C-alpha cells in the first residue's frame, strides 16, 4: 500500500501521522529517494508493505535512468497487489505524473482522498476528480466535520480599503469618458453611460438566463490593489487588531498575497510599521530570469538574513527548503519547537505567503488567515481550513479577513461553501459579534434568574441545591464560550458594540447587560463548584452531580 503525497512537507507530516496510527506489528516506511522507493516496492519483507512517498518520486520510476529499472522489475512489482492512497487528490492528479504512474502500474487500485474534490464548476483540463478516480464512494463534508465538532467553523470578514462609492464613481466616469460628474451629467449620452455603471452591483454574477454579468469590481485593475494606499491600509488593519485577534500573540496567522513582488513589499511594510511583529515570508526561491529577478533575490536575501538574526539560524537562499521546514515546525509547535509557547520570543507571529502552506499544512496554533488575494472553490476552502483545527476555549473559530475585491470574494465564498458543504452550509460560519452579545445577554438573564429563584442576591454564593448547581455549571460554560468568541471579534468591557448596517451605513449601539466585575464574580462561583467545603469537609458522594467540567474554566483570573 503506497500513500502518495504531492509535496515533501505533506509527506513528512503524513508519515508521522500514519506511524502514530499504525498497529504495533506494522511499520510505515519512508522513501528518501527513487532508489529506495524501488527497493521497497520490489521487497518481499512484510515491513515494506506500507510506504509513504511523493508523486514525483513515483512518476520518476519508469524513466529515471539512474535506477536502471528493467521490464522484469516492473513486472515483478506489477505482480503484487498494489493500492495507491492519494492524499489531497484535488491537487496534482490532473498532470502527466499521475498518468505516468497509472500507465506504469495498470493493475493497481487508486483511492483519492480530499475535502475539496474538483467538480464540474471548477474542472481542470475538462476533467473532475471523479474522472480520475471514478465516482465518489463516500462524502464527509467540511460542514459535517464542523457540526460533529471535529473542526471549527469560520468567522469571515470583508475589509474595504476603498469606499464603494468612490470605486463606483471612478468606473462610471471612465466608462462615460468624463473627467468629472459635472461633465458626465452635462452630456445626455455620457450621463446615460455614467448612471448605467453607477448602478451596477459591486460584484458580478449571472442573470436570469445564466449569462455572466460584470460588477464594478470586475472593472477595477489589479494595480488598484498593488499601490501604497491599499497596502498600507491592509497593514494598518492587521497591526491595529493584532493583540486582540492573536490573543496577545498566543496564536499565529498566515497572510496570503497575490504575487512574490507583493509578498516582498508587504514584508518590508510590516518590518517598518510593526518591528515588534515577528514576521517572515515564504515563496518559491528560484530566481526569475527577467527584470524582476534582482528585486526578488534582494528581497529573499533580506528575509533570510532577518530570520537568521531573529532566531539564531544559519540559512541561505540555497538552503531555503530547510528554512521552510523550520518555519513549518515553528508555526505548528512541532519538533524541535514542541513547547515554543513557553518562549514567545522564539515564536513566529505572521507568515506571508503567495501559494505555499495554503493546502495540507496543519497547525492548531493558526487562528487567522488574511487574504490580499482572490481565491475560488477548492483553493478557497483549503486556505480557510488552515485556521480551523481544534484547540481549546481560546479558539472558538478560524477568522478570515479578506481585502482584495471584497464583494467578489464574498460571492466566491458563497459559491465555494455551496459546492463543498453539500449545499447545507448551516453551522459553517459562526455568529457575528452582535449575535454573540445577544446570546450572552440571554444567558446572563438565565443565570441571574437561577440565583434569584434560589434566594441568592448579587451572586454572593453558589446555590445549595445540586440540580441548580449543575444548571449553573452548564449555563456558565456556554456563557464563557460565547464571551471568548466575542472577545476575539472585538468585544471590550465597558465599551458599546457599534454595529454598522452594510447597506445603509446606519450605526446601532449594542450593550452587554453585565460588566467585568459581575463576570469575575460568576467565574469565582463557578470555581467554587469544584473546591472543598469551607470547613474542609469533602462533598457527600451521594450529592455528586455529573458536571460537564471544563478544566480551562476553573483557571479563569478572578482578581
Where are these regions (language model features)?
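Conserved segment of the helicase C-terminal RecA-like domain
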Residues: 386-418
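Catalytic cores and motor modules of nucleic-acid processing enzymes
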Residues: 12, 210, 242-246, 258-287, ...
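Interdomain helical connector at the RecA1-RecA2 junction of SF1/SF2 helicase-like NTPases
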Residues: 123-250, 267-272
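Conserved helix-turn-beta segment of the N-terminal RecA-like "Helicase ATP-binding" lobe
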Residues: 8-35, 272-276
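Conserved RecA-like ASCE ATPase "motif II neighborhood" in helicase/translocase motors
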Residues: 50-86, 91-100, 334, 353-355
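Inter-Walker segment of RecA-like/P-loop motor cores
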Residues: 20-66
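Conserved Walker A/P-loop ATP-binding site and its immediately adjacent core
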Residues: 1-20, 257-263
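Conserved C-terminal RecA-like helicase domain
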Residues: 49, 201-353, 511-514, 518-533, ...
Amino acid at each position: 500500500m503506497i500513500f502518495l503525497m504531492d509535496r515533501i512537507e505533506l509527506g513528512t507530516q503524513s508519515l508521522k501521522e500514519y506511524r502514530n496510527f499504525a498497529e504495533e506489528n506494522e511499520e510505515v516506511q519512508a522513501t528518501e529517494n527513487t532508489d529506495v522507493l524501488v527497493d521497497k516496492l520490489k521487497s518481499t519483507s512484510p515491513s515494506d508493505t506500507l510506504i509513504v512517498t511523493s508523486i514525483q518520486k513515483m512518476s520518476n520510476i519508469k524513466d529515471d535512468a539512474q535506477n536502471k529499472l528493467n521490464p522484469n522489475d516492473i513486472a515483478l512489482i506489477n505482480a503484487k497487489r498494489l493500492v495507491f492512497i492519494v492524499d489531497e487528490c484535488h491537487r496534482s492528479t490532473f498532470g502527466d505524473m499521475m498518468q505516468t504512474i497509472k500507465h506504469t502500474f495498470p493493475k493497481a487500485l487508486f483511492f483519492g482522498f480530499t475535502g475539496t474534490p474538483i467538480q464540474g464548476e471548477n474542472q481542470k483540463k475538462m476533467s473532475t476528480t471523479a474522472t480520475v478516480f471514478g465516482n465518489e464512494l463516500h462524502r464527509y463534508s467540511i460542514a459535517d466535520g464542523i457540526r460533529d465538532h471535529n473542526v471549527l467553523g469560520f468567522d469571515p470578514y470583508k475589509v474595504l480599503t476603498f469606499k464603494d462609492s468612490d470605486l463606483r464613481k471612478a468606473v462610471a466616469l471612465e466608462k462615460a469618458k468624463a473627467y468629472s460628474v459635472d461633465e458626465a451629467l452635462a452630456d445626455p449620452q455620457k450621463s446615460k453611460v455614467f448612471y448605467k455603471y453607477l448602478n451596477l452591483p459591486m460584484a458580478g454574477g449571472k442573470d436570469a438566463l445564466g449569462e455572466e454579468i460584470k460588477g464594478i469590481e470586475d472593472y477595477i485593475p489589479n494595480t488598484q490593489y498593488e499601490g501604497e494606499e491599499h497596502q498600507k491600509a491592509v497593514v494598518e488593519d492587521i497591526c491595529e487588531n493584532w493583540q486582540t485577534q492573536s490573543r496577545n500573540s498566543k496564536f499565529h496567522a498566515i497572510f496570503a498575497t497575490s504575487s512574490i513582488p507583493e509578498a516582498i513589499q508587504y514584508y518590508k511594510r510590516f518590518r517598518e510599521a510593526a518591528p515588534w511583529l515577528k514576521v517572515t515570508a515564504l515563496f518559491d526561491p528560484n530566481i526569475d530570469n527577467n527584470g524582476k529577478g534582482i528585486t526578488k533575490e534582494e528581497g529573499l536575501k533580506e528575509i533570510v538574513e532577518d530570520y537568521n538574526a531573529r532566531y539564531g539560524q544559519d540559512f541561505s537562499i540555497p538552503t531555503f527548503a530547510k528554512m521552510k521546514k523550520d518555519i513549518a515546525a515553528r508555526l505548528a509547535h512541532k519538533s524541535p519547537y514542541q513547547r515554543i509557547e513557553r518562549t514567545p520570543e522564539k515564536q513566529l507571529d505572521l507568515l506571508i505567503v503567495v501559494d505555499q502552506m495554503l493546502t495540507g499544512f496543519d497547525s492548531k496554533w493558526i487562528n487567522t488567515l488574511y487574504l490580499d488575494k482572490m481565491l475560488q472553490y477548492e483553493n478557497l476552502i483549503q486556505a480557510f481550513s488552515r485556521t480551523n483545527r481544534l484547540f481549546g476555549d481560546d479558539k472558538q473559530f478560524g477568522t478570515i479577513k479578506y481585502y482584495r475585491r471584497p464583494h467578489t470574494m464574498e460571492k466566491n465564498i458563497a459559491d465555494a461553501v455551496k459546492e463543498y458543504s453539500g449545499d447545507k452550509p448551516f453551522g459553517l460560519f459562526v455568529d457575528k459579534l452582535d449575535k454573540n452579545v445577544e446570546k450572552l445577554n440571554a444567558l446572563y438573564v438565565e443565570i441571574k434568574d437561577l440565583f434569584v429563584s434560589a434566594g441568592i442576591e448579587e451572586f454572593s454564593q453558589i446555590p445549595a441545591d445540586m440540580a441548580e448547581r449543575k444548571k449553573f455549571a452548564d449555563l456558565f460554560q456556554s456563557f464563557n464560550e460565547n464571551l471568548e468568541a466575542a472577545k476575539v471579534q472585538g468585544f471590550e468591557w465597558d465599551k458599546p458594540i457599534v454595529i454598522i448596517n452594510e447597506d445603509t451605513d446606519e450605526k446601532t449601539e449594542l450593550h452587554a447587560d453585565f460588566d467585568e466585575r459581575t463576570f469575575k464574580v460568576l467565574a469565582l462561583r463557578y470555581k467554587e463548584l469544584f473546591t472543598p467545603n469551607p470547613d474542609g469537609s469533602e462533598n457527600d458522594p451521594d450529592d455528586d452531580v455529573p458536571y460537564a467540567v471544563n478544566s480551562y474554566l476553573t483557571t479563569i483570573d478572578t482578581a
